Amino acid sequence: MTTIKLHNTRTRTKEEFVPIDPDNVRMYVCGPTVYDRAHLGNGRPVVVFDVLYRLLRHVYGADHVTYVRNFTDVDDKINARAAERGRPIGDITAETTQWFLDDMGALGALEPDHMPRATQYIPQMVAMIEELVAKGHAYEAEGHVLFAVDSWKEHYGKLSGRSVDDMIAGARVEVAPYKKNPMDFVLWKPSTPDLPGWDSPWGRGRPGWHIECSAMSYELLGESFDIHGGGNDLMFPHHENEIAQSCCAHPEGHFANFWLHNEMLQVEGKKMSKSLGNFFTVRDLLDQGIPGEVIRFVFLSTHYRKPMDWTEKKAKEAEATLRKWWRLTAPLDEMEIKPSPQFIDALTDDLNTPGAIAELHRLAKEKDYAALEAGLEMLGLQETVNFGVASFGFSTSVEVLEAANDLARRWMAYRDAKNFEEADRLKKSALLAGVDLSVSKEGGIQVPSATINGSPTVDELEALK
């Protein structure tokens, strides 16, 4: 069987991945808190772990991999957003959850096998907290229940490589008079009548952030599973606290064997910030006409453990490359394809996506279009709606883009069938409507030109078929 090697944050080494059960490979990735649009940085872990999910399915079989990514739908940020907008909390979370799914779908991400909402697992959280209290790892104080870090002191901080004393001195923690130790963190907090709350042995309240992932992963994957992933910013305190809770509540297990963390994202060499004017949501870029596949390509062009810099230049280069590759692989729809061994070697070496992309460049140069298509598919970069139609020079609806895309397919089909009379007829008609169907130097279809005959409409393009 193919060997996968992954960098394990827990051991700080690249290790051979050996699943607990090859017939039931299990992965948990921390998902979003649903109160706003996903920004560009939120998209990176989704794409990274989507590629890992695809690789695991390739190696172990789609029916033998379980991927869980949660939604945090109870949180003080959500409460604040609902109050700010004067809308019910449930409306905010439902709307934002769908936004996230739509935007990540546009980035080519497969939906995980399970997408639990925190509010669906409150009883499991209460049960885990009760277990921690009973075992002396948690205590009640002024309506709160807190995890006692001193009860796990010899292990706490190993993931992030910090000592408890150093963390007390320098970490950002909530200091409250009811804490026995400044590092103790909230498992349960009281709720006022205007905030979401559930009945519990400690009164009406709501869970802390960290207990949510521990309870959901235990319920869906068990006390021991293979991989836990997330952004580097979650390593401390979130992942550190998850380990403490889960291992203390279920000492018979060892929680996650492998921990993977992706690095952060910059924009044009600077930290993404609203104050700098370089803060983008995924939807912002999609609405600017940047295809989701292009965003994904830029993400994958940098190794997941290195900081990534989003630039306009990279986006343009990615688009040109993808359109060329899509043109080369267009006639292969009915062929049986499989990725090249070198492509798989790159991905199995700690998700070396830049190396995998370099292999795709080689395959294109060597005219191995079947392996190129297979590699694109495995990276989630196969063509979708935007096939062959370069960026419009004007604001273009999805409907117009799809109609132009259909013309491109028909034109190429005529050419491939050597029906040059019909190909020429369609080319001339399309040109009059504002779409130049000649092949560009990048291998794609030339842009529709507003200078030819204005912006084409769907009806005009449909009439050409």
Swiss-Prot record:
Q: Which residues bind ATP?
A: K274
**Chief place where the protein resides:** cytoplasm
The record's EC number reads 6.1.1.16
Q: Which GO terms describe its cellular component?
A: cytosol
Q: Where in the cell is it found?
A: Cytoplasm
MF terms (GO), sorted A to Z: ATP binding; cysteine-tRNA ligase activity; zinc ion binding
Record keywords: Transmembrane included?
no
Q: Which GO terms describe its biological process?
A: cysteinyl-tRNA aminoacylation
Which residues take part in binding Zn(2+)? C30, C213, H238, E242
Q: Which SMART domains match?
A: DALR_2
| InterPro entries (UniProt xref) | Cys-tRNA-ligase (IPR015803), Cys-tRNA-synt_Ia_DALR (IPR015273), Cys-tRNA/MSH_ligase (IPR024909), Rossmann-like_a/b/a_fold (IPR014729), tRNA-synt_1_cat_dom (IPR032678), tRNAsynth_Ia_anticodon-bd (IPR009080)
Task: Report the cofactors.
Answer: Zn(2+)
Q: Which SUPFAM superfamilies match?
A: Anticodon-binding domain of a subclass of class I aminoacyl-tRNA synthetases, Nucleotidylyl transferase
Q: Which reaction does it catalyse?
A: tRNA(Cys) + L-cysteine + ATP = L-cysteinyl-tRNA(Cys) + AMP + diphosphate
**Family, per the entry?**
Belongs to the class-I aminoacyl-tRNA synthetase family.
What is this protein's name?
A: Cysteine--tRNA ligase
